[in-house]
UniProtKB/Swiss-Prot annotation:
GO terms for biological process: protein maturation. Belongs to the HupF/HypC family. It comes from Azotobacter chroococcum mcd 1. Pfam families: HupF_HypC. One of its GO terms (molecular function) is carbon dioxide binding. This is Hydrogenase expression/formation protein HupN. Signal peptide: none annotated. It comes from the Bacteria. NCBIfam families: hypC_hupF. Residues 88-108 are annotated as: Disordered.
Length: 108
């Protein structure tokens, strides 16, 4: 299983960016993506940026990684706050919703 880590760009240079989180900063290869700007979020795997992220998606991934650490540490109480969006019904993307038959008036 591959796990990408969201890191925020602190400084840019040609083909690389200094990126960090709350623990460390390190230089990341950015040649696989459009050149980032300071403040951007990147999904990083094996020292290379694989995609640019918006701040909300970066936070979701960070929460999921924190949840994994909490489970490993046996702290199950921490999970509720880390997966706050799991109490909602999943939504199909619009192109799949269009393929569903119309709902009956009395159906949920």
């Amino acid at each position: 299983m591959c796990i990408g880590i969201p890191l925020q760009v602190l400084e840019c240079a040609p083909g690389r960016a200094l990126c960090g989180d709350d623990r460390e900063a390190r230089w990341i290869d950015t040649r696989l993506i459009e050149p980032p700007a300071p403040g951007d979020w990147l999904l990083v795997f094996l020292g290379a940026a694989r995609e640019a992220l918006d701040a909300e998606r970066a936070a979701q991934i960070r929460d999921a990684l924190c949840a994994l650490q909490a489970v490993q540490a046996g702290d199950l109480a921490a999970l509720d706050g880390l997966f706050a969006d799991l109490d909602r019904e999943p939504q199909l993307p619009p192109h799949l919703q269009a393929q569903l038959p119309p709902k009956e008036p009395n159906s949920p």
